[in-house]
Amino acid sequence: MRNDRLGANVLSALLISNVDAGLAASLELKPHHRSLGIITSDCDDVTYVALDEATKAADVEVVYARSMYAGAGNASTKLAGEVIGILAGPNPEEVRSGLDVVVYEIENGASFYSANDDDSIPYFAHCISRAGTYLSEGANAQEGTAIAYLIAPPAEAMVGLDAALKDAVAKGYCDWKSIKVIG
């Protein structure tokens, strides 16, 4: 049905308490990053937002996040999913806290929604009032900046973005100089 929450699923969430030096080097970890949290899910955009939430809630950084582009319904194995994210932190407790936030956000937070009755046209329109370190870096914005994250069919996304920007400027929420569109 229209406006159905389509949801996302965590497929795997694992913790490495004391990362191997070789793996740490290949991930270009900082010296204080001793523990890793690794997560896969069936939805990349939701996972990126969830990873960013973890950077605000725990002493962790996103050190790797990549879409595998198999698609949510086309994962190559049961645990592979569409995306992998890796958090790094100083100890297992911080990383576990970060992973807990990621899992919660994927399962209960940001989501794709249906734009039509048979759920065949999904869209993702999520407002982040205060971006953490991960999304602010990706948006080339200061940490704490508000970000609108929009994924939709291309033409509809552009029309929606135009309407949202016009409304935000008209209401005084921002001015044209403060807006960055990242494609």
Show which residues each predicted segment covers.
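Conserved mixed alpha/beta catalytic, RNA-binding, or beta-rich assembly cores of soluble enzyme
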Residues: I16-H32, I39-L51, T55-A72, S76-G89, ...
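N-terminal basic/disordered segments at the start of proteins
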Residues: M1-G22
